[in-house]
From Swiss-Prot:
GO biological process: phospholipid biosynthetic process
Designated gene of the protein: plsY
Pfam families per UniProt: G3P_acyltransf
Catalytic activity: an acyl phosphate + sn-glycerol 3-phosphate = a 1-acyl-sn-glycero-3-phosphate + phosphate
Disulfide bond positions: none
Compartments in which it is found: Cell inner membrane
Protein's recorded name: Glycerol-3-phosphate acyltransferase
Upper lineage: Bacteria, Pseudomonadati, Pseudomonadota, Gammaproteobacteria, Alteromonadales
Length: 200
């Protein structure tokens, strides 16, 4: 990896972009409980689905993915090498996980990581989306779907565009590590399943 002023600037910009908590902002705008203290306590799309319904969750998902996609796409267009590209994508995820603007209490980084992978190609984006949806439908566990999709992402990338296998593997490793508590709960049968807010 070649460290340049441009690379360092992109890493900082990606972290700051990732630090904008879509879940907290959407919940504030829509008069919903703070996702850091309500539901599962995780400020991400799945928890917003639980406490605010599908439309709010969709907004959070879109903006969380955008936080990863924009820095990765800009870095790619600037010709930054693949390993540095992975570092920039990870910086966006770390911003989401440890946001400087929200007392370093963030989400799991799944949507942001998948957003960073999406610019690699439509085929990869579709494969990731289908894998996640199928796993959720089968298991009803968002965490298991995220872990499974993350583990398969480097394999998909190897077949579709092997140049980006290393940065995708870096992101996948971060996602799995971030879900270590979920893995323990899954093994104990204590993990919460996906649900949505019931209409009153």
């Amino acid at each position: 990896m070649t460290i340049t002023t441009l690379t360092l600037g992109m890493i900082l910009a990606a972290y700051l972009a990732g630090s904008i908590s879509s879940a907290v902002l959407v919940c504030r705008l829509r008069g919903l409980p703070d996702p850091r203290t309500a539901g599962s306590g995780n400020p991400g799309a799945t928890n917003v689905l639980r406490i605010g319904g599908a439309s709010s969750a969709a907004m959070v998902l879109f903006f969380d993915m955008l936080k990863g996609a924009l820095p990765a796409y800009i870095a790619f267009r600037l010709g930054i090498d693949q390993v540095a590209l992975g570092a920039i994508a990870i910086a966006a995820c770390l911003g989401h996980i440890f946001p400087i603007f929200f007392k370093f209490k963030g989400g799991k980084g799944v949507a942001t990581a998948f957003g960073a992978m999406a610019p690699i190609g439509h085929e990869l984006a579709l494969a990731l989306m289908v894998t996640w949806i199928v796993m959720v439908l089968i298991s009803r566990y968002s965490s298991l779907a995220a872990i499974t999709t993350a583990m398969l992402a480097p394999i998909y990338t190897w077949f579709l565009d092997e140049r980006f296998t290393i940065p995708v593997a870096m992101l996948s490793t971060l996602i799995v590590i971030r879900h270590r508590d979920n893995i323990h709960r899954l093994l104990k049968g204590e993990e919460s399943k996906v649900s949505r807010k019931k209409k009153g």
